[in-house]
């Protein structure tokens, strides 16, 4: 109440922010007359002028932190003039002038916030303002879209403006090779999808050469449809995986018994709070979980012919039974997935689009394949993974735009530190939002929807019907066919021409049935979209040709004034400008006339057939109508059998039925019911937010480890000298551990296990300390350690002298990269196993997250210790072979002889086994049974990496079910100084590892 009173007096925070930006809008408008006098060349010259000013300012500073602060200041200074230049370029090149509210939206994006702009307010054009301004720094700007079509369309469409102003533009889509990707990332402005940006990051961190990496620094990203990417897809980690060796027979074995299990329910026991499970298993649709009863497990044991399911040897089967029940009870064909060409394809629950290449993880996808009787693919092992939350946190500055962000403002702030600013519409919103209509059954609801569409068709008012699944869109389509109502069905099965169908949904008398989110990013113009109609006509007449035709590339250039380029159905076409403009003008006249007719009919009518779990998705559907001051209307038709009502408002629905005694076919229309439904949606949103936060809390643990490993890889790729690290830290730590074990300080020297110490030193380093002149019996603990360390250092430097400094650095890099990659892959698998079982700790009154943090830290420490041990062992045991005699060369303390090549015992097999070295008696270690030269070894690595990177190029995300990146600035940290991350550990044992 108090907040409302304050808002009434002082205005809301949003209104105050808009008011604060208005003087800058006035500055930009004041510059417009002057800018309009510039010639095209003078306008372009301003880009070079801005760039020079930025570089001059940055040249005054050396520290990265100071440069970043200076960059922010200078960009803010030139913002009014840069926006004025961009606005004028938009008018000259695109025939589009930025409205004042679009200038405000651009300023919000530049400041690293989310700009909420209603559908049709020109978000694509708004983005050009902050993109142009920030691209002047030369550090690159990424514009992130939800699909390849929008990335191509926007890069080509807005690219004309950027090219006119002297900026380069690149686009990242699925089928590009590394050279094409690298070129696109080097551009001033790069368009692409969230998946492509994320997978490129993971692939870069699997590369063996710095020159093979494609991305550069993460400077500034603007995320289009930011709610879809950062909220809806937040539970979908990006995963690059490779096939595991496990058999798929177990999925078939388990699948055949599931139909013989009986579904039950949870009922109240005699004592308060007691729950009794009937049947063999119970399904919780609200949380998407299943619980198997004791009777159910007994039946499973009998059906599978095994002993106690709880025995460790049966844990794997237990997991597969639970996953198979989920596949049968919670995942339905034409709802969560479709079967196409013998393959199970996931349907995106938010967009209704198919997601080829994506697979559910944890064995779920295999369980669904077994259920549907298609080929069961092998389960995958994770090679690299990251969530969108942690990927987008890599950017120094992040911004977003969407038509619906306000309902998720708290989550954007908490997770991403992004503030939402609602931008006023350029024209008054005229859309009429009618109250919900609720029917008793789903059957009654769909009959009523069909009747309503029939009525609207009489007046030829266009209708866009939103459905939640393929199955329901096809069900409604059948009803309309019976009424002879012409319509278009747009769902995941027929999405290839999605943008075209949605763009024409505003034509007179048009009826379009689509999933709630179909065609997002495509404007629905009342009367139809003349450009789409012109494209179809030019293709039909053969006027337009594909750019990459069968006979070769069409002889035309994007900057040729006599041609027009455009995308259609995923392909690029070129058309003579004169013919294009003639055909376009014809259809423009037709659609302008039809536009007025549609307005008279009431504009686009949005008819929702079910409320989504999120209010935001409902608002997005409503937002398709009433763009830019056009009339429009919306209404939702619901039933008490809808999932939202049945699962999340069950008790309220039962009470409603009893009180009102609803009769068949009689609807309820009440704002009170709409409010209750929104309350149910708020509860679901809160639950989903907790799920996303839960995922992030776990991924933050992994993120720290990932940043440490990727940081080490980057150092190695950049060719930094690792000798000091290997000798002064790795060797020192390993030697210290050996001394603690065999010559502990608490024991008298006479009780030390010198034979054991000597054997371990020989096994790990190939050095016989006795033969090298170390006399343990005459030394104290410190002298013994120093003596051994000196001999180990001498051996390393002698080997380095023999093969040369450059070659030694090269082999250090190859060995360290291959060892850390193999260990990281194994670590990811172990982390998956840990996460699977960590929830059970709750039964022992232990916080699973705390336990996960503790155990994962121990596992990571163990992995890094193994990395150091294997690195040192492989480098020390690497043998030098005389090329003439093909025999090992003794490592002398002199210059290297001529005609030597290297031979090493490192990773003779591709999966890096331990080197088989025997020690003792002062003898040189024998050669391995099969020796592998480092040249051959590197070829093995290259082949292996090629396979993994090829898998990575085709990668899809797994779908199971914030810590800021630490940036160090200032003076170099010493190895024994406290680590900058605040862990309390020494730098050499933390981020210096």
From Swiss-Prot:
PANTHER family: CHLOROPLAST PROTEIN-TRANSPORTING ATPASE (PTHR30612:SF0), SECA INNER MEMBRANE COMPONENT OF SEC PROTEIN SECRETION SYSTEM (PTHR30612)
Entries under InterPro entries matching the protein: Helicase_ATP-bd (IPR014001), P-loop_NTPase (IPR027417), SEC_C_motif (IPR004027), SecA (IPR000185), SecA_CS (IPR020937), SecA_DEAD (IPR011115), SecA_motor_DEAD (IPR014018), SecA_preprotein_X-link_dom (IPR011130)
Keyword list, A-Z: ATP-binding, Cell inner membrane, Cell membrane, Cytoplasm, Membrane, Metal-binding, Nucleotide-binding, Protein transport, Translocase, Translocation, Transport, Zinc
Family, similarity comment: Belongs to the SecA family.
Keyword Magnesium attached: no
GO biological process per UniProt: intracellular protein transmembrane transport; protein import; protein targeting; protein transport by the Sec complex
Residues given in the record as ATP binding sites: 102, 120-124, 523
Enzyme class: translocase
Function: Part of the Sec protein translocase complex. Interacts with the SecYEG preprotein conducting channel. Has a central role in coupling the hydrolysis of ATP to the transfer of proteins into and across the cell membrane, serving as an ATP-driven molecular motor driving the stepwise translocation of polypeptide chains across the membrane.
Membrane topology: Peripheral membrane protein
Assembly behavior: Monomer and homodimer. Part of the essential Sec protein translocation apparatus which comprises SecA, SecYEG and auxiliary proteins SecDF. Other proteins may also be involved.
Region feature (Disordered): 910-962
E.C. no: 7.4.2.8
DNA damage is among the record's keywords: no
Subcellular location field: Cell inner membrane; Cytoplasm
Protein species of origin: Koribacter versatilis (strain Ellin345)
Record: residues binding Zn(2+): 979, 981, 990-991
Name of this protein: Protein translocase subunit SecA
Gene responsible for this protein: secA
């Amino acid at each position: 109440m108090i907040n409302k009173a304050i808002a009434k007096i002082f205005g809301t925070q949003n209104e105050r922010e808009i008011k604060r930006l208005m003087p800058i809008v006035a500055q930009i408008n004041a510059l417009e007359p002057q800018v309009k006098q510039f010639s095209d060349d003078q306008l372009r010259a301003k880009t070079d002028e801005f760039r020079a000013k930025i570089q001059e300012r940055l040249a005054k500073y050396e520290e990265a932190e100071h440069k970043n602060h200076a960059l922010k200041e200078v960009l803010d200074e030139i913002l009014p003039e840069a926006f004025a230049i961009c606005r004028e370029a938009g008018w000259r090149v695109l025939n589009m002038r930025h409205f004042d509210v679009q200038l405000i939206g651009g300023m919000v994006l530049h400041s690293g916030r989310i700009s909420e702009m209603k559908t049709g307010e020109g978000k694509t054009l708004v983005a050009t303002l902050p993109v142009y301004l920030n691209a002047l720094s030369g550090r690159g700007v990424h514009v992130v879209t939800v699909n390849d079509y929008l990335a191509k369309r926007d890069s080509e469409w807005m690219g004309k403006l950027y090219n006119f102003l002297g900026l380069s533009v690149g686009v990242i889509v699925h089928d590009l090779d590394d050279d094409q990707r690298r070129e696109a990332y080097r551009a001033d402005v790069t368009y692409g999808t969230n998946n492509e940006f994320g997978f490129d990051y993971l692939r870069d961190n699997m590369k063996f050469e710095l020159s093979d990496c494609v991305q550069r620094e993460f400077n500034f990203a603007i995320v289009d449809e930011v709610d879809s990417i950062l909220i809806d897809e937040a539970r979908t980690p990006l995963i690059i995986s490779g096939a595991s060796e496990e058999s798929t027979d177990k999925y078939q074995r388990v699948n055949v018994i599931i139909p013989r299990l009986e579904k039950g329910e949870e009922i109240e026991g005699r004592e308060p709070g007691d729950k009794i499970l009937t049947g063999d298993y119970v399904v919780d649709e609200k949380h998407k979980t299943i619980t198997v009863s004791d009777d159910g497990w007994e039946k499973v044991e009998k059906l599978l012919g095994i002993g106690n399911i709880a025995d460790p040897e049966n844990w794997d089967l237990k997991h597969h039974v639970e996953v198979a029940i989920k596949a049968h009870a919670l995942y339905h064909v034409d709802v969560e997935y479709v079967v196409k060409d013998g393959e199970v394809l996931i349907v995106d629950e938010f967009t209704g689009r198919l997601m080829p290449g994506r697979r559910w993880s944890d064995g779920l996808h295999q369980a669904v394949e077994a259920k549907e009787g298609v080929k069961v693919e092998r389960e995958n092992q994770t090679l690299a993974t990251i969530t969108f939350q942690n990927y987008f946190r890599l950017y120094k500055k992040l911004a977003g735009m969407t038509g619906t962000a306000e309902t998720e403002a708290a989550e954007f702030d908490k997770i991403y530190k992004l503030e939402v600013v609602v931008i006023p519409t350029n024209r008054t919103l005229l859309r009429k939002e009618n109250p919900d209509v609720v029917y008793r059954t789903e059957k009654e609801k769909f009959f009523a929807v069909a009747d309503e569409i029939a009525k609207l068709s009489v007046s030829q008012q266009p209708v866009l019907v939103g459905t939640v699944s393929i199955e329901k869109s096809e069900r409604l389509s059948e009803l309309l066919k019976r009424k002879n109502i012409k319509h278009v069905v747009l769902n995941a099965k027929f999405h290839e021409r999605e943008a075209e169908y949605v763009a024409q949904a505003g034509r007179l008398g048009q009826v379009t049935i689509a999933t709630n989110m179909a065609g997002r990013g495509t404007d629905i113009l009342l009367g139809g979209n003349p450009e789409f109609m012109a494209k179809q006509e030019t293709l039909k007449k053969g006027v337009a040709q594909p750019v990459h035709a069968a006979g070769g590339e069409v002889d035309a250039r994007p900057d040729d004034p006599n041609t027009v380029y455009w995308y259609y159905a995923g392909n690029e076409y070129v058309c003579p400008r004169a013919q294009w403009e003639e055909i376009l003008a014809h259809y423009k006249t037709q659609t302008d006339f039809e536009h007025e007719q549609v307005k008279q009919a009431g504009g686009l009518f949005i008819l929702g057939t079910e409320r989504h779990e999120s209010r935001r998705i409902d608002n997005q559907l409503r937002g398709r109508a009433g763009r830019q001051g056009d009339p429009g209307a919306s209404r939702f038709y619901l039933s008490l059998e809808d999932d939202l009502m049945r699962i999340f408002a069950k008790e309220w629905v039962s009470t409603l039925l009893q009180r009102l005694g609803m009769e068949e076919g009689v609807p309820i229309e009440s704002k009170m019911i709409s409010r209750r439904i929104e309350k149910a949606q708020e509860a679901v949103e809160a639950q989903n937010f907790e799920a996303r936060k839960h995922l992030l809390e776990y991924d933050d643990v992994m993120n720290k480890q990932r940043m440490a490993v990727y940081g080490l890889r980057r150092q190695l790729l950049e060719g930094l000298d690792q000798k000091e690290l290997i000798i002064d830290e790795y060797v020192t730590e390993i030697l210290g551990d050996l001394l603690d074990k065999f010559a502990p300080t608490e024991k008298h020297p006479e009780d030390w296990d010198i034979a054991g110490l000597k054997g371990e030193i020989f096994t790990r380093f190939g050095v016989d300390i006795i033969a090298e002149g170390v006399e343990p019996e005459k030394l104290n603990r410190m002298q013994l350690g120093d003596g051994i360390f000196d001999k180990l250092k001498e051996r390393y430097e002698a080997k380095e002298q023999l093969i040369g400094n450059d070659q030694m650095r090269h082999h250090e890099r190859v060995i360290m990269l291959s060892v850390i990659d193999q260990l990281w892959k194994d670590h990811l698998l172990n982390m998956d196993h840990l996460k699977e079982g960590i929830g059970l700790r709750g039964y022992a009154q232990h916080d699973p997250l705390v336990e996960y943090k503790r155990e994962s830290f121990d596992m990571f420490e163990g992995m890094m210790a193994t990395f150091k041990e294997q690195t040192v062992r492989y480098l020390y045991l690497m043998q030098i072979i005389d090329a003439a005699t093909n025999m090992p060369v003794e490592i002398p303390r002199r210059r290297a002889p001529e005609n030597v090549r290297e031979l090493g015992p490192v990773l003779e097999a591709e999966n890096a086994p331990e080197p088989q070295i025997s020690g003792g008696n002062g003898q040189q270690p024998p050669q391995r049974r099969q020796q592998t030269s480092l040249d051959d070894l590197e070829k093995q690595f290259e082949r292996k990496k090629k396979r993994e990177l090829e898998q990575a190029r085709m990668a899809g995300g797994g779908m199971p079910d914030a810590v800021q990146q630490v940036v160090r600035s200032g003076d170099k940290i010493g190895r024994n100084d406290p680590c900058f991350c605040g862990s309390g550990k020494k730098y050499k044992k933390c981020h210096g590892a």
